[in-house]
Structure formats: C-alpha cells, structure tokens
Amino acid sequence: MKPPSGLEEAQRRQASDIRVFANSCTMHGLGHIFGPGGLTLRRGLWATAVLLSLAAFLYQVAERVRYYGEFHHKTTLDERESHQLTFPAVTLCNINPLRRSRLTPNDLHWAGTALLGLDPAEHAAYLRALGQPPAPPGFMPSPTFDMAQLYARAGHSLEDMLLDCRYRGQPCGPENFTVIFTRMGQCYTFNSGAQGAELLTTPKGGAGNGLEIMLDVQQEEYLPIWKDMEETPFEVGIRVQIHGQEEPPAIDQLGFGAAPGHQTFVSCQQQQLSFLPPPWGDCNTASVDPDFDPEPSDPLGSPSSSPPYSLIGCRLACESRYVARKCGCRMMHMPGNSPVCSPQQYKDCASPALDAMLRKDTCVCPNPCATTRYAKELSMVRIPSRASARYLARKYNRSETYITENVLVLDIFFEALNYEAVEQKAAYEVSELLGDIGGQMGLFIGASLLTILEILDYLCEVFQDRVLGYFWNRRSSQRRSGNTLLQEELNGHRTHVPHLSLGPRPPTAPSAVTKTLAASHRTCYLVTRL
C-alpha cells in the first residue's frame, strides 16, 4: 500500500477527528458534547442525557432479544368454508367381544381362565349356561391356540349386525367397512382408506348427508357374567369413534356409546390443527424414539405401507415394544413382528404390563405437526315408535321386544360445510424484533441504520489513521534514517577529496578508469584508479 502524501494525511486526520464526526453524525446529541470549546455545564448535561438515553436503548434491545430467544407462540382460530369435506373414518365395536354361540370347549380350555375367570372345573357349567353341550369324553385340546383367530371367528360379524346402511342416501354394505383389531376385539371401520381406497366426501352438511346405519347388537349372543373381573362389561350397545384416516382408533379410550332402542345423532365439525416444531413448539413428523416403526394392526393381514405419523400410532408402537420386551409377545391389536400372546400370557403378563405402563405414561410421543380432529355433539331419540315397531318386527322377522332391546340407529353428519383451522404461529418474528429495535433506536438516541453505517465508517477512518498511520510513519522514519546514513557516508568521502593535489597533474594513461563520487551542477569529484 502506498503511504499517504502530506495532503492525504491531513485529510485523514481531519476525518478521524471526533469533533468533526460529532458535528456531521446524524445521531442526536453528539454535536453538543464534542463541540468546540472547553468543558461546560451545558456540555456535561448533554453528555449525561446522551449516556442515559443510550443505556435505556441498550436495555430495551436486550429485553427484546431475550424475549425473542424464548420463542413464544400464539394460537389462532379461524372458521373457514369449503366446497366439500372429506368424511371421517368411523370405527364400530360391539361391547360384547365374543359370541356365546361360537365358543367351543377348546376355547374355554385355553382362554376361559384368562378372559372369563373360569376355573377348569367350571367349564361344564359355563357351557350349559351358554346353552351348549359339555365337552365330549376323551376331549383333547388343540396343541396351539391363536387369540386373533379366536376373535376373528367368535367376534360379532358385521354381516349379521348391519341391518341397513346408507351414505348420502345411497346404499352401502359390509364391503364398505374394513376389519380392524382393537383392545375391544374385532371392530369395523367405515371409510378407512385402507388398501388405497378412495376417501368419501360430502358436499353438504346436515342430517341425510352423511352415514346412517341400523345395527342389531345381538344381545342374545352376549356372554353371561360368571365372575366380576377388571374389564367385565355390564352395558349393552356399541362403541363408536370418529377419527381421521391417518391415525388408528383408540376406541377403548376415546369412543362414545350408542345404546339399543335409540337413534343417536352425531353432529360433527372438522378441526384442522397445525402445530409448530422446535424451538417454538414440540411437534414432529416422526417419533423421537428411534425404534418407532408403525406396522399394520391387523394380525391376520399382510404388511402394508407404513401409515403417516400420528400420536395414537406412536403410542401404540411404544406400547407394543414395551409388552414385547416384558412378555416376549404382543397383544393382538398391537403392531409389530412379535407373536400374538397366548391367553395365559394375556392374563399373567401383557394386560398387567400394559396397565402399569399407561399409569406411568412412559412413552415419548410428540404431537404431529398437522392433524385432523372432529368435534361432536350427540343427541338421541327413542326407537321404535309404536307406529314403526310392528313394521320393523315384520321386516326383520323379529319380535317388537327384540327390536326395542337390540336395534339402534346411528346418524353421523357434518353440522355445516365449514371447518375450524387451529394454528400455532410464532408470536415474535425477526421482522418484529428489528422493528422494535429500530423504534427504540429512534426514540432514545435518534438514530437509524444509516447512523450505524456512519459510526462504522468513522471507526474505519480511526483505524486507518491510528493503526495504519502508525506503521506508515514508522516506515517513513526508517526511510529517513537510511537517507541520513547515506548522506553521512557521502560527506565523509567529500572530506578526503581536498587532500588530493589540485595543481597541475601529469598526464594520465589512456587506460585509466575514473569514477564519479559526487556530482552537482557546479563541481564533480573524480577518483582516478590507475
């Protein structure tokens, strides 16, 4: 870098002068502090005011930065309209898990103690209570037993329960339902979207624009209560859960009941929930558990593609791994590759382990970043009326008493063709942080972004003057010192030149060599080397 000339150095020193900068800076108050003249009371007051304003500004900036670092969020609720809505999945389970007419002596041998609390000596009496003959002499139980096959064979069949089905006025049937295993046994899901089936939609709200089904709960197939056990059902009817297609049902925890002898109206409203990921929230699209790997819950079905992440699915996979580690098997409604637990494993290990785990709530499952829920309002009326009882009895070849005690109607529909959008949003964005800092800067010190650039420019001038100027001055001093030494050497040679004879000289040989030691416009000193 070329060292500055005298004029450039003077200009640079003027630019780095604090008084010059204070008079030209757009920051308020500096001109009153660093103006010409000595220290006065007025200048001291201005300095105090500027320092207090600067301290207040820095405090506000620190508070705003701290608040931004806490990553607060806000929740907004918006009512939105839609031309059509996807109809939810509807899962149905009969409260009675097994039909009495389908139980065999082999079933009681394997599952009687675990499921019904029966002692082996009570099997014959229980079979008589079921209206079935006792085990024949020489009865030999099967060497193995599969709980999933028991529920698939002895559970209530939808073909027998479903008396009538209509979706938006169009007939539907058992083929529109998908078999799924839950903790309540074999259940059925309408509009599940399984196997890539197209999801049903509705363009209208209100009754008659959704699913309407008539069911026979088959109360005569309910198992007799032999002993009071922990999960003994005393009610009659079905359990219903309305949920999104992306999550498996948890009907034993989230389902509501529908009783025979009533028509239950379920008015739904779709809620689309959107959560924020860290650091503003805790949502995730995958479980924080690295072992999370959702698999189909149908123990009799073939594996299919993994469903999207959901809170219920994550908990179900977590419970399955816990039971598999504790018992070496899994319950029939759980995903995984472990074998299904035997009835004795259900009683001695799986059910107690699962209940203990649910009490501790040890599964780490964050909320999904996007999910769909359905708010419900239930109302009901008694059926059948006196006018319709005889007609229904004749139509289904049943007595009027049977119709009253076993038949129910379930009507599920959207209240209106709109949905609620519940969204989490960052409560304090970067733009708001910059806006607050800019506002505080203008309020307290009368500065802006350009003022900061002015200060940076001044600091560059100071650096160039004080730091780089120091090295330039040092280099110039070294150069001047070198020139002084050279001049002294030349002066030394000049002092020896007068001892030479300046009178007439003998002629020199032509081969002589002369060297000029010093020259000027007046004289030239020569040293002759012979």
UniProtKB/Swiss-Prot annotation:
Source organism, top-level taxon: Eukaryota
The protein's name: Acid-sensing ion channel 3
Record region (Disordered): 285-307
Topological region Extracellular: 63-440
Subunit structure: Can form homotrimeric channels. Heterotrimer; forms functional heterotrimers producing channel with different properties. Forms heterotrimers with ASIC2; gives rise to a biphasic current with a sustained current which discriminates poorly between Na(+) and K(+). Interacts with STOM; inhibits ASIC3 acid-evoked current. Interacts with LIN7B (via PDZ domain); increases ASIC3 expression at the plasma membrane. Interacts with MAGI1 (via PDZ domain); probably regulates ASIC3. Interacts with GOPC (via PDZ domain); probably regulates ASIC3.
Cytoplasmic side: 1-43, 461-530
Keyword Glycoprotein among record annotations: yes
Domain commentary: The PDZ-binding motif mediates the interaction with PDZ-domain containing proteins including DLG4, GOPC, MAGI1 and LIN7A.
Gene this chain is encoded by: Asic3
InterPro entries: ENaC, ENaC_chordates, ENaC_CS
Phenotype caused by lack of the gene: Mice lacking Asic3 have normal development, size, fertility, and respond as expected to most sensory stimuli, but develop hearing loss early in life. They display altered responses to mechanical and acid stimuli, including an increased sensitivity of mechanoreceptors detecting light touch, a reduced sensitivity of a mechanoreceptor responding to noxious pinch, a decreased sensitivity of acid- and noxious heat-sensitive nociceptors, and a reduced latency to the onset of pain responses and more pain-related behaviors, to stimuli of moderate to high intensity.
Cited function: Forms voltage-independent, pH-gated heterotrimeric sodium channels that act as postsynaptic excitatory receptors in the nervous system. Upon extracellular acidification, these channels generate a biphasic current with a fast inactivating and a slow sustained phase. ASIC3 is more sensitive to protons and gates between closed, open, and desensitized states faster than other ASICs. Displays high selectivity for sodium ions but can also permit the permeation of other cations. As a neuronal acid sensor, probably contributes to mechanoreception, acid nociception, and heat nociception.
Low complexity bias locations: 298-307
Residues that span the membrane, as ranges: 44-62, 441-460
